[in-house]
Amino acid sequence: MRRWGLWEQETNVHTVAESDNFQSFPDRVEILCLTGTESFDVKGQQLIKTLQKGFPTKFLSSQMSSKFGLAGGIPERRVRPIWDAIDSRQFKNALKLVTSLLAKYPKSPYALALKALIHERMGKTDEALSVCLDAKELLYKDDLALMDDLTLSTLQIVLQRLDHLDLATSCYAHACGKYPNNLELMMGLFNCYVREYSFVKQQQTAIKMYKLAGEERFLLWAVCSIQLQVLCDKSGEKLLLLAEGLLKKHIASHSMHEPEALMVYISLLEQQSKYNDALEVLSGDLGSLLMIEVDKLRIQGRLLARANDYSAAVDVYKKILELSPDDWECFLHYLGCLLEDDSIWKYFDNIDQIHPTKHIECKFSHLTEEMFDSRISSASDLVQKLQRDAENSNLRGPYLAELEIEKRKFLFGKKNEDKLLESLLQYFLKFGHLACYASDVEAYLQVLSPNKKAGFVEMLVKNSDSSASATKVLGQTTTILKVQELTGNIFGLPTDEIEASAVKLAKLYCQNLSLSKDLDPQESMFGEELLSLISNMLVQLFWRTRDFGYLAEAIMVLELGLTIRGHVWQYKILLLHIYSYVGALPLAFERYKALDVKNILTETVSHHILRQMLESPMWVDLSNLLKDYLKFMDDHLRESADLTFLAYRHRNYSKVIEFVLFKQRLQHSNQYQAARVEASVLQLKQNADSFEEEERILENLKSGVQLVELSNEIGSRTLKFNEDMQTRPWWTPCPEKNYLLGPFEEISYCPPKENVKEEREENMKRAIQRKSLLPRMIYLSIQCTPTALKESVETNGSGGDIDVCEELKCLLEDYTKMLGCSLSDAVEMITEISQGARTSESLGSNLVDWLNFAVFWNAWSLSSQEHWHVLNSLFERLILDRVRSMGSSDMSSCYSDVQVLVQIITEPLAWHSLIIQACTRSSLPSGKKKKKNQHSDQLSSSPISQAIKDSIQLLCSTIQDVSNWLLNQLNNPEDGQVEGFLTTLKRDGNAAGPGQILGVLESFIASSEESEVGNRIFQALKSWNTADTARKTVMAQQRVLREFLQICESKRKLLETLKQQMSHV
């Protein structure tokens, strides 16, 4: 997939600092990155590649040897063995050696820094920090001979890992105060400010270095720091004038010597909309710094267009297209300038590589029809010339340009649908066998009417070349099916036609399997996409008929594909979502792990599995998933400054801006914020049966205050949606939507995969904010109980400490506001549902959130019997309705109900049980042998005591009903379930329904010869077993049920214990 590959490439660019190799690099590499040796700058790019490959660090010995003599006067021969021991991870030996070194040099800050580094590597963080502070104290003494860059850089490494970068910064600042003319120390201080993202102090330090050394690079460091202030801190744009003045003064006295410096200057002028000034710079002597003519022309064209000199920009872009006819972005710029349409710049300014839009706005209102015709005719002439020049090549750009022109005509109102269809057909005849055809024409299909879309599919079928080579016929057939999916035409076909089409594709796949017999397993096979298309058809057939056999058949088809070639990510993602739907979540998680998601892909791809895991009882796997994701994100956010500083050092200033903005984008990721909250809530869910453990967790969470602060922060910021939704199946375009859960009548066409960021952002923000309030509300609810019980006995008041109750009420108001209503309306809603006046459907997809509200609303006024009754009725109604809805259904057809029950029992019911535990603890005598006092006697007869007992009894009974359903499912013999799974695929003779594709595949496998398909494919075909696949699916479903049953039994036992304790009250 094109964009998947894009992110794999970007991983290497953006995440050197957090890659697996980087984490294990010896510290010498890190120290070398911090030092000021010129040899480091000379071959910076080579060093980055070396870092990425994890190259051994012995080659650094020569550079390091020159530094060792400066480390407080310690000879290199005494230090080298310590570094060798650290490099080989022999930390005990290294500690022994450094202890010996300190005996000889007790006042050496460098020796102490080495000791701190060793302690940190051994996981002794407290000892490491203590030693760092000792070294810092020595550095602050008057003996200037003890202060050198190697000591400071070693301390910086340790302190950064200990999250005390401020101490390292203070050490460097002190050193720079002592050595105001030491460039190396000032560079170290600049690096500290880079790590702190302190752009103002970066600027100030860079200016000092520039004044000291007069080097161009330090001035550009300052300019980049100013640009970052404007971009990230939203500082006044007057700073840009300051930066421009500094550059002009430098150019007047020293000129410029690097292309990157020129690019910074031009970007600075562009930020201020000084396009004519930028053009003047580019056309002057400095323009000669850009050696590649096309690059220079692109900049010139952009500046001319933004200066509204469209005619000159058109001439420039024509030159570029003559030099590079396949430059698609350039053609769009050319056409935009020709039509004086500035919307193209808005598109490219805001282009999102994760969510690229297929539609580009076009403006025509300012053009008369005559003007439009004249200019579009000029564009057509250019395109025809480019096509003639590229006639014997495989360039798609000139032919795609013809489609763009026809689309512009159509949007202008020329009513040229037939001409556009003809151009699409011609493009098919030339490139229809390529896998990219469907994605190339998607934007042009969207402007056609439904009838024309259906007619276009028929045109493709009629004009496909059956006499061409087998690979070309296969490619064209695949393209036609993909276009049929894009147009939604397939959703209007009768069921039997879809079945027939799927069978035809299965036969085509089998017939062409021999074309791939000599391919390497890593290479894509011919017709590989056919199995994905077949599975999409089968899923649609299931949606229409609710016949589980179609889903089972889709599973079999995709598993066969993975058996033949296990590297196809499309098969894994489709299986992941099908397994998730039928409740075989362990297999779904297995398929996700098989994607081998690493680095930035954890941010863009984990949406495929995260939501399902959050709604499942598979807490161990969920915990690992969250830990891995948060570790990558936290490591990147902590260490991304390493790469930013490398960009500064290597004079790659555009990357400086890019890396900082990329870091900010990840930092504001909605998924990252959600995962941080979910990780904390998961801990509470896992330990909800132990009151003492919950208190410990809440204490670690600062009583939930930190997450409340996070909720407030999220409310005032714009979240970034980095998930790559283009990789999701059609039936679940985003994690919150699954068309299979509703009837087929609700949608009659395949929804276009469009950017859903705008419509999701507010909902996601509110969901994260609501979740962030849970730990604090749990804490406050627990704090309310002792006073509430006391006041219930003494005054029958509302109960609870006034301040605590007031805060809880405020949070409840915030919570309901995030649910879209007021507190009073929310109370009315849950009351009516508990009484049966409204159905649970009124709660929508936020059912669990509403139940959470009801739990804490009850905790806010524990002495109200009415509140207890409403809450009890809600639990009973919402849980038993689901149990009755599932009835005798098997897991495959009711897993969505199981997901809801899992959430109810592990969240609101768990929090309510926790509050009951707090009530029980407060109501019981503190000593085992202590007799009941008067307060206890009064409590036993108080209304609240009876309400607690009734609630415990109801919850026990309700959970037992859930457990009974789970036991009924688990008591079904595994072999019987496997047989039932396979029975859905069996059919009589030529009857329609599930099993037809499976029949084609099984017949082919039975008759296939090794000489025909090759040894590897032949062995894979013979190893494929439908019974094994069915058994794995059933076992995965049973594992989910067992995990859920274990949770239910744990809750029931807790409630039984609480029932016994309350009987003594």
Curated annotation (Swiss-Prot):
<dbReference type="GO" id="GO:0005737">
    <property type="term" value="C:cytoplasm"/>
</dbReference>
<dbReference type="InterPro" id="IPR019734">
    <property type="entry name" value="TPR_rpt"/>
</dbReference>
<dbReference type="InterPro" id="IPR019183">
    <property type="entry name" value="NAA25_NatB_aux_su"/>
</dbReference>
<dbReference type="Pfam" id="PF09797">
    <property type="entry name" value="NatB_MDM20"/>
</dbReference>
<comment type="similarity">
    <text>Belongs to the MDM20/NAA25 family.</text>
</comment>
<dbReference type="GO" id="GO:0009506">
    <property type="term" value="C:plasmodesma"/>
</dbReference>
<dbReference type="Pfam" id="PF13432">
    <property type="entry name" value="TPR_16"/>
</dbReference>
<feature type="repeat" description="TPR">
    <location>
        <begin position="294"/>
        <end position="327"/>
    </location>
</feature>
<keyword id="KW-0802">TPR repeat</keyword>
<comment type="function">
    <text>Auxiliary subunit of the NatB N-alpha-acetyltransferase complex. Required for flowering time regulation and for vegetative and reproductive plant development.</text>
</comment>
<keyword id="KW-0963">Cytoplasm</keyword>
<dbReference type="InterPro" id="IPR011990">
    <property type="entry name" value="TPR-like_helical_dom_sf"/>
</dbReference>
<protein>
    <recommendedName>
        <fullName>N-terminal acetyltransferase B complex auxiliary subunit NAA25</fullName>
    </recommendedName>
</protein>
